[in-house]
């Protein structure tokens, strides 16, 4: 009982953030006057005026030499106070029932699969913790593709939450019961469901592969930027399309997750929303057991220039926060580390009373009227639809910054003592009959005790209030998600014959294949048929490849245009940035460049517009460095050209082995949709490029053409008559000679870097 619990008088490091030194208030009366003044300004003139005054004071303090401690964190409470919450527009009761049914079907799908097929795998706990985050989005925010089929939001669903998306699609009538029974069994007669979002396996359903972890965040950032690129170049209106990325707090340890967030703020991508499910757990245990991951991420994203919205506590905590005039509750919330919060999840209310509130007598007094059961049921913010709705609504208000929502949840929410908040939650994929009964009862699923063990899927009658509401909400928002069109818009493309004369000009000259391919790329950017669709992508190597002449011709894309006079403005090939620029100059990031390639290479399915990416880079820094993103490109059916520059035995020998690429062709063989070539002559690169244009864009094939290009000058030979087909297939007869009285006949094979040696060898008399 509350009246027999004694407050903890000794501060302990156990379960708490280490204490920090704070300033002593030497004049409490003066402090209260300042606080009252600020409260008056907020009340009478609004938060904008208060913000201005505080900024002015901060600036004055700096001018007078007052050193203020850097503060990147706000208190461990919700960013949006109750009084600023918008009214919730939906039917809370119907939405709760729909969400509960989806929870059951998602859980039953995984448990059933592992009951009948031992070791099949799957994940329950991620969606269990994030169901509210998704359902508020599906019911009120996520825009479908609409009548055009290409005007919806782009959503990167967290890979481990895929069972929840399947369960919702089942209710919508897009998936059958047999589909759900075949979870992770794609080869069954009636199509099964892939483990994670895989467009290659489910081309009409998934759009974006988000596994392995870290891929979704970086690709979503560059997708949001590419949407702006399309709009600024006048190719497609994308202003109303949002990019949502759902990810986990543990996923933020992946370099790709946080590595490009500064680009998002630099490009003012207020069309981008990250939702981080902070359930405080990863596979092995706590994400930050001895710290506070929400505070850590808040500091990181704030420092990178993002809007940060914290959704930490549910509405049950509001009366306590309002009643606490001492500030001790907010202080206690900040003191407790994540590992201890995880402990509270699995403990009774009496433990929470003693170990959380019991630290201070005032807090025990605050909850003396609360039963232990009531304390147990006080939710985290990510499980409160009204708090989540308020966060999403604010994120939709564009202010020139991307937004991250840090939503605190419980991993395995609803799974009971065997899975809720436990370290084993991530790998949980089985449940006994008692656990199923408890889950059924907790979420009110109309399945009898006798049938629970069979794990049947449940779908309300078509004329039920739940089904009518579910379908009406999605119709209002433009249709179901995720969804991917399978029809491919084809386009008229130029042929090799259109460019043959340009190629023939090189015959007999000493040139590199890099120079040849850049010439073709420059011409293609001006081509009447496809010029505006070409997307040159370079990770800060344009001058290495001799592309600087394209700066003035087509411009470098910059969302704000060029706000300065470039130092080389008096030169012909000056560094020209423009809002409608065509080149994506990505800086030193092959990963970011590949993410742009993926966005451009899937524009045909995402936007209904064929864009043609040409990603040129140092060949050594391609497949072996960003192979996972290339695999994602293949999975999401991207198309385009990857050009591996300075390939083979480069003339840059002084650069060392890091620039001696003899194996990227071997790496390329690991990617099923990649067609890899090692040309030696410019006519070969030209034939391959125009073959790629014809097959990928003229005929609609899904492929990526990888073409190695070198920087060693070759004497450009004439193209042998009738060799086009052989070039595309990978082998053709370049030259032959008969030698009188020869003792035998030798066939020599060669390409790219070795071909000069092969040609010299062919002159030896046997």
At which residue positions do the language-model features occur?
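Conserved small/polar residues in nucleotide/adenosyl-binding loops
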Residues: 764-766
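Cofactor-binding active-site loop characterized by glycine-rich and histidine/acidic residues
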Residues: 85, 89-102, 106-116, 123-267, ...
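Non-catalytic terminal/interface segments that mediate subunit docking, oligomerization
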Residues: 85-106, 127, 142-146, 153, ...
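N-terminal amphipathic, basic-rich helices that act as targeting or association modules
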Residues: 2-171, 439, 514-518, 522, ...
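A short alpha/beta connector and helix-capping loop motif
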Residues: 254-279, 630, 637
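A glycine-rich helix N-cap at a beta->alpha junction
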Residues: 174-185, 268-275, 303-304, 633-648
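Active-site phosphate/pyrophosphate-binding segments
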Residues: 366, 495, 635-747, 754
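Long, well-ordered, tryptophan-enriched scaffold segments
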Residues: 278-505, 726-734
């Amino acid at each position: 009982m509350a009246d027999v619990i004694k407050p903890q008088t000794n501060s302990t490091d156990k379960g708490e953030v280490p204490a920090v030194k704070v300033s002593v208030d030497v004049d409490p009366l003066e402090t209260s006057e300042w606080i009252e003044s600020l409260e008056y300004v907020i009340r009478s003139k609004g938060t904008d005026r208060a913000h201005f005054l505080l900024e002015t004071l901060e600036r004055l303090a700096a001018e007078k030499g007052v050193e203020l401690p850097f503060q990147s964190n706000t208190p461990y409470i919700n960013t949006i106070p109750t009084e600023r919450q918008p009214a919730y527009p939906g039917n809370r009761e119907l939405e709760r029932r729909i969400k509960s049914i989806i929870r059951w079907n998602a859980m039953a799908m995984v448990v059933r699969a592992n009951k009948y097929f031992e070791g099949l795998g799957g994940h329950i706990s991620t969606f269990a913790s994030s169901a509210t985050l998704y359902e508020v989005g599906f019911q009120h925010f996520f825009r479908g593709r609409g009548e055009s089929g290409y005007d919806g939001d782009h959503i990167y669903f967290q890979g481990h939450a895929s069972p929840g998306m399947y369960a919702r699609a089942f209710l919508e009538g897009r998936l059958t019961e047999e589909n759900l029974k075949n979870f992770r069994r794609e080869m069954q007669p009636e199509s099964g469901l892939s483990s994670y979002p895989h467009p290659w396996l489910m081309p009409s359903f998934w759009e974006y592969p988000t596994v392995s972890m870290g891929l979704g965040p970086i690709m979503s950032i560059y997708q949001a930027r590419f949407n702006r690129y399309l709009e600024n170049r006048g190719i497609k209106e994308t202003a109303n399309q949002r990019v949502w990325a759902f990810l986990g707090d543990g996923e933020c340890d992946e370099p790709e997750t946080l590595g490009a967030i500064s680009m998002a703020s630099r490009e003012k991508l207020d069309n981008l929303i990250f939702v981080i499910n902070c359930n405080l757990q990863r596979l092995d245990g706590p994400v930050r057991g001895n710290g506070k991951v929400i505070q850590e991420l808040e500091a990181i994203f704030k420092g990178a220039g993002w809007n940060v919205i914290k959704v930490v506590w549910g509405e049950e905590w509001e009366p306590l926060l309002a009643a606490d005039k001492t500030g001790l509750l907010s202080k206690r919330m900040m003191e407790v580390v994540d590992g201890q919060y995880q402990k509270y999840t699995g403990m009774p209310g009496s433990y929470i009373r003693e170990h959380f509130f019991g630290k201070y007598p005032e807090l025990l007094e605050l909850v003396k009227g609360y039963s232990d059961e009531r304390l147990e049921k006080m939710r985290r913010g990510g499980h409160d639809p009204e708090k989540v709705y308020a966060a999403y609504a604010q994120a939709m208000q564009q202010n020139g910054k991307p937004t991250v929502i840090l939503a605190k949840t419980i991993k395995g929410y609803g799974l009971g003592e065997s899975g809720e908040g436990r370290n084993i939650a991530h790998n949980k994929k089985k449940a006994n009959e008692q656990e199923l009964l408890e889950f059924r009862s907790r979420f009110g699923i109309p399945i009898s005790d006798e049938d629970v063990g069979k794990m049947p899927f449940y779908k309300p009658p078509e004329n039920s209030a739940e089904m009518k509401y579910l379908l009406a909400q999605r119709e209002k928002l433009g249709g179901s998600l995720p969804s991917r069109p399978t029809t491919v818009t084809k386009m008229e493309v130029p042929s090799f014959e259109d460019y043959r004369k340009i190629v023939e000009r090189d015959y007999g000259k000493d040139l590199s294949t890099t120079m040849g391919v850049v010439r073709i790329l420059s011409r293609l950017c001006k081509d009447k048929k496809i010029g505006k669709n070409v997307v040159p992508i370079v990770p800060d190597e344009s001058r290495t490849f001799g592309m600087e002449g394209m700066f003035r011709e087509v411009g470098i894309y910059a969302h704000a245009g060029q706000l300065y006079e470039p130092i080389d403005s008096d030169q012909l090939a000056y560094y020209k940035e423009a809002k409608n620029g065509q080149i994506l100059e990505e800086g030193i990031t092959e990963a970011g460049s590949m993410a742009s390639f993926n966005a451009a290479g899937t524009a045909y399915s995402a936007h209904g517009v064929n864009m043609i990416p040409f990603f040129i880079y140092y060949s050594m820094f391609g497949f072996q460095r960003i192979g996972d993103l290339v695999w994602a490109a293949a999975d999401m059916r991207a198309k385009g050209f990857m050009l591996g520059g300075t390939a083979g035995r480069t003339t840059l020998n002084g650069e060392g082995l890091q620039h001696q690429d003899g194996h990227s062709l071997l790496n390329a063989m690991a990617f099923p949709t990649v067609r890899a070539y090692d040309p030696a002559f410019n006519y070969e690169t030209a034939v391959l490029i125009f073959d790629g244009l014809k097959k990928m864009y003229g005929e609609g094939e899904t492929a990526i053409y990888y073409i190695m290009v070198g920087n060693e000058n070759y004497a450009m030979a004439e193209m042998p008559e009738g060799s086009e087909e052989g070039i595309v297939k990978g082998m053709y007869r370049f030259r032959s000679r008969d030698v009188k009285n020869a003792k035998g006949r030798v066939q020599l094979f060669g390409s790219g870097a070795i071909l000069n040696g092969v040609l010299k060898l062919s002159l030896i008399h046997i």
